[in-house]
Design a protein with these regions (language model features):
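Nucleotide-activated donor-binding/catalytic signature segment of Leloir-type glycosyltransferases, i.e.
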Residues: 226-252
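Conserved donor-binding/catalytic core segment of Leloir-type glycosyltransferases
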Residues: 139, 163, 167-171, 176-194, ...
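Glycosyltransferase donor-sugar binding loop
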Residues: 187, 191, 212-226, 240-244
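Donor nucleotide-sugar binding/catalytic pocket of nucleotide-sugar-dependent glycosyltransferases
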Residues: 108-111, 128-172
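Short hydrophobic beta-strand element within catalytic cores of glycosyltransferases
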Residues: 260, 274, 279, 283-286
Length: 353
């Protein structure tokens, strides 16, 4: 991303360990990082049983060896025991956890695809056992994720709790809907799991209402979605923005009317896109998957069955629009998903526990 964020005075950001896949492979192969460990895990994980698993394992091993050989990593790993190591994802950099020594706290936050192996190809996540054996605190973005971990990884000795993510307070848009049009917004990658085309299918079942649907996000299915817009009824206007920056997303909320936010994904963790929507006091219609029911309640919107029909979504769009004054989404955001409250609380918790 080209967006830059300000840093506190006591924060140091190291340069990337590698800047290209070629540099990664070279550094991962031609270094003095341990080899025997990775050969042993290749056998114990049976990563040789399929081509996908083998390729995934080799790529992961090369990445780990590249990181372990980095001079900045080595320096950090030698620092005092009174240190806290925090990984934002349970995959990727977290794979080096077994090699981090003399640290007081090793903390990993888990989301969705880094937690649920059944969402990964061949249900395979490398070094799963080693990551859970090495951490001493696991943080989950949803209560649903926390319960999943307790059930599936309860044999490992670590403390666990749920700490919601959050979004910044940008206020509430002063743009009012005065044109009688139902303004629908959705925001996701256009990929199969997000089922964006089902939104269009549902909107076509509301012929007697003027509707403007804006979808924010690109992806592999973007061109195919565009093709479906060739012949739209007169009452329906569709705007596909493609991929845009988060600043532009916030700008859309601030400068355009939005009546309903829609998310019909087949699988979710706990969507930040919904957090943003309810922060602007916009009611949500979303599928009851993952931890979505922790943010879409009777106060903030309506939940759909994961296997909803297009007609069901169409009916709910009309109902929520006609009764949107009954919803108070921002109240829920203030209580549970305000970054200004959640992140200081999280930092205090991980430092003081």
């Amino acid at each position: 991303t080209q967006e830059q964020r300000s840093l506190p005075a006591n924060c140091i950001v190291f340069p990337p360990i590698f800047r290209s896949s070629g540099e990664l492979v070279f550094k991962g192969l031609f270094c003095f990082s341990p080899l025997f460990y990775f050969f042993k895990k290749l056998i114990s994980e049976k990563a040789y049983t399929s081509l996908y698993k083998f390729k995934k394992y080799i790529a992961t091993a090369i990445t780990c060896r590249c990181i372990l050989a980095d001079k900045n990593f080595k320096r950090l790993n030698r620092q005092s025991t009174e240190s806290t190591v925090y990984f934002y994802w349970g995959i990727g950099m977290a794979y080096i956890l077994p090699f981090i020594h003399n640290k007081d706290k090793k903390i990993v936050r888990f989301h969705r695809t880094d937690l649920y192996a059944d969402l990964r190809p061949h249900q395979y996540i490398p070094f799963r056992k080693e990551v859970f054996e090495s951490l001493n605190k696991a943080v989950f973005i949803s209560k649903q994720g926390l319960e999943y971990a307790k059930k599936n990884f309860g044999q490992y000795k670590f403390s666990a709790y749920c700490s919601y993510l959050g979004t910044k307070d940008h206020g509430i848009s002063k743009i009012k809907n005065e044109d009688g049009v139902i303004h629908i917004l959705s925001c996701s990658n256009v990929v199969p799991v997000k089922r964006v085309s089902l939104i269009l299918k549902s909107l076509l079942l509301i012929p007697d209402r003027p509707i403007q649907w804006t979808h924010i996000g690109g992806g592999k299915g973007f061109n195919a979605l565009q093709q479906q817009l060739q012949q739209l009824p007169a009452n329906l206007t569709v705007h596909l923005t493609g991929a845009i920056t988060n600043r532009e997303v916030i700008g859309h909320y601030l400068h355009h009317p939005v009546d309903i936010f829609v998310n019909v994904s087949a699988s979710e963790g706990l969507p930040v896109s919904i957090m943003e929507a309810i922060s602007f006091n916009i009611p949500v219609i979303a599928t009851n998957v993952g931890g979505t029911n922790e943010i879409v309640t009777s106060e903030s919107g309506v939940l759909l069955d994961p296997h909803f029909s297009a007609q069901e979504l169409a009916d709910q769009i009309v109902r929520v629009y006609e009764h949107k004054d009954r919803f108070h989404p921002r109240r829920l955001w203030e209580e549970k998903f305000n970054a200004g409250k959640n992140y200081p609380r999280f930092i205090s918790q991980i430092l003081n526990d």
